Amino acid sequence: MTQRLKTFYLNTVVPKLRKQLEYQNIHQVPQVTKIVINCGLGEASQNAKSLESTLRDLSFITGQKPIVTRAKKSIAGFQIRAQMSVGVCVTLRADAMYAFLDRLIHLALPRIRDFQGLNSNSFDGHGNFHLGLKEQLMFPEIDYDKIEKLRGMDICIVTSSQNNKEALQLLVALGMPFQTTLTA
């Protein structure tokens, strides 16, 4: 089953961006290559139950089993040792990526309280967009009664474009709600 956002990208966004950016080849048009979702857990070392609930929540949100990220070396100031669980991470590609991006744009972001749009300064200079969410309740897959604690997550949308302007044009064409469109 092809995703709705993927067919919209192929049929509408690609011809529009090809004309705007004046590319000769259709493969030069920027595209979303992957989405990385990271959820850091400070209390995972003391509470194994929080790690399990975060794994469950992230698998509900993404539809894919997350991996547990571990500390590379010991840091006494944070009271962690090497190989201790410090977070949960998921990398989405292909159809799962388009399904998540569609739900993020059309379901999750409009449910944020006092949402004014995404900040267009959150690009990293290489065409990748980063956003942070403060709670997981905005996703319809999460049941309010079954969560133990509100946890935020970092979402990185990696594009094939080499600069921020092309990536911003791509995400605006896909429907991402930015505060000021195309000011980069």
Curated annotation (Swiss-Prot):
GO biological process terms on file: translation
- Subunit structure of this chain's protein: Part of the 50S ribosomal subunit; contacts the 5S rRNA.
Database matches in NCBIfam families: PRK00010.1
List the Gene Ontology MF annotations in alphabetical order: rRNA binding; structural constituent of ribosome
Q: Which UniProt keywords apply?
A: Chloroplast, Plastid, Ribonucleoprotein, Ribosomal protein, RNA-binding, rRNA-binding
Q: Where in the cell is it found?
A: Plastid, Chloroplast
What HAMAP family is this protein classified in?
Ribosomal_uL5_B (MF_01333_B)
Q: What is the official name of this protein in its record? A: Large ribosomal subunit protein uL5c
Q: What is its main location?
A: plastid
* One Pfam family of this chain: Ribosomal_L5
Recorded hits in PANTHER family, A to Z, give:
60S RIBOSOMAL PROTEIN L11-RELATED
Q: Its GO CC terms?
A: chloroplast; ribonucleoprotein complex; ribosome
Tell me which family the UniProt entry assigns to this protein. Answer: Belongs to the universal ribosomal protein uL5 family.
Function statement: Binds 5S rRNA, forms part of the central protuberance of the 50S subunit.
Q: Which organism is it from?
A: Zygnema circumcarinatum (Green alga)
Per the UniProt record, the lineage of the source organism begins with: Eukaryota, Viridiplantae, Streptophyta, Zygnematophyceae, Zygnematophycidae
